[in-house]
Amino acid sequence: MESLKEMRKAQKSEGPAAILAIGTATPDNVYIQADYPDYYFKITKSEHMTELKDKFKTLCEKSMIRKRHMCFSQEFLKANPEVCKHMGKSLNARQDIAVVETPRIGKEAAVKAIKEWGHPKSSITHLIFCTSAGVDMPGADYQLTRMLGLNPSVKRMMIYQQGCYAGGTVLRLAKDLAENNKGSRVLVVCSELTAPTFRGPSPDAVDSLVGQALFADGAAALVVGADPDTSVERALYYIVSASQMLLPDSDGAIEGHIREEGLTVHLKKDVPALFSANIDTPLVEAFRPLGISDWNSIFWIAHPGGPAILDQIEVKLGLKEDKLRASKHVMSEYGNMSSSCVLFVLDEMRNKSLQDGKSTTGEGLDWGVLFGFGPGLTVETVVLRSVPVEA
């Protein structure tokens, strides 16, 4: 028994897991939000739905988004008219794009993260790949392993259909892997596409327009590991704790269902209110051990699910106007990229902290929170510790 305890102790890291590198990538196709209503109703042959188009214009104007990136080109949509219908039988065409583009964009982000990390890719011991697009076997984790030329013995974990909260999920899983497998280095990739969800408008599904106004494509990658080798590696943030919570009275608030017509997404109007009404519970539980209860004293990396969610969080917690700056910037420049979005926010925060001459990667603050929100309704709460900025 004593030798078993010694073995177990030897397997664990000395310190907490740290984020050692971040990389991001987007498709080449860029859509300016101000022009998108005209494009969307034209490409879907829905210009006769003038009242619905006016509603969509209002959604886009209030979205906080300046531009988005999407893998679907105008040429592809013209060649696949079933994708442009509201409920056209189009799963095969969507899959053909998703199973190729999901690992491809993920690879672009991963290459950037590995380059920043500084170690050879052969030192990657674990891979976590997360997406809500392109379910396939073998999965995107396998495809990425081959594309990057990772060690064939890399321990892979494939996560499908988690949605927007999974940017927090992957950090929670990576933390557990890094801290319980001494010397391990975990490559985390979230790659999300609108290929399954893009569809034309319908007067009978106004909630679908919300997703069409907000969702976008993008991939983010991290390298996570404990006990950094300071001769090569540098921690960007330490992952102090991670937890998950289902919000009360939220059944059916966000749902997604795979059909012959693709992935149909359903959003209830009270989603922002449900999140804001319950956000203080996971916050209090996460920061009680640190004695922190002033939410303006920490840095914020919140999933920018939509402008209403961010606005109501600010009001509920009494946050200063600049607290959600990083989330709003990512929303403006990229839209809602599901699980990868909050990792873009993380990258934005560390970059802006350096540009502005802040003392830490957390905008000069030591402690912070990363929030993922999504179907369930599920909230992932990750407590982060920033590090001093090195010019």
From Swiss-Prot:
GO terms for molecular function: acridone synthase activity. It catalyses: N-methylanthraniloyl-CoA + 3 malonyl-CoA + 3 H(+) = 1,3-dihydroxy-N-methylacridone + 3 CO2 + 4 CoA + H2O. The active site is at C164. Pfam families: Chal_sti_synt_C (PF02797), Chal_sti_synt_N (PF00195). Keywords: Acyltransferase, Flavonoid biosynthesis, Transferase. GO terms for biological process: flavonoid biosynthetic process; polyketide biosynthetic process. Its EC number is 2.3.1.159. Belongs to the thiolase-like superfamily. Chalcone/stilbene synthases family. Homodimer. This is Acridone synthase 2.
